[in-house]
Amino acid sequence: MKRRSHSVNLGKTKHKPEETCQAFEDISKYFSKEEWKKLSRSEKITYVYMKRNYTTMTNLGLRAHLPDFMESKERVTKSVLSDSDEVSSHESQDKRKNPVV
């Protein structure tokens, strides 16, 4: 019995150019123009599949973590700041518990 390969040859797919392809338009809105230009084609495709996977999982009723690139820039910045606040508060708590003599 022959096995068929289900892998996709990205170089030979017959899709529209990425500028007009809906999937790339959906993803490009999460990046600045400069960031988008710096991404390789394979990175762009990875983001397309990450978004599709997230959408599929949530449509099935599963709880999934929103990919970082899909979060708003403000929300990501606040998250990073709150994480750094947590680290510094833990460090200060440790210093109070174990004072240096």
UniProtKB/Swiss-Prot annotation:
Domain KRAB-related as annotated: residue spans: 19-83
Major site of localization recorded for this protein: nucleus
CC per GO annotation: nucleus
Tissue specificity: Specifically expressed in testis (at protein level). Not detected in other tissues tested (at protein level).
Protein name as annotated: Protein SSXA1
Species for this entry: Mus musculus
Keyword Transcription: yes
Region entry Disordered, spans: 73-101
Keywords: Nucleus, Transcription, Transcription regulation
InterPro entries registered for this protein in UniProt: aKRAB, KRAB, KRAB_dom_sf
Keyword Transcription: yes
Subcellular location per the Swiss-Prot or TrEMBL entry: Nucleus
GO biological process, one term: regulation of DNA-templated transcription
Disulfide bonds, paired cysteine numbers: none
Cross-referenced PROSITE patterns: KRAB_RELATED
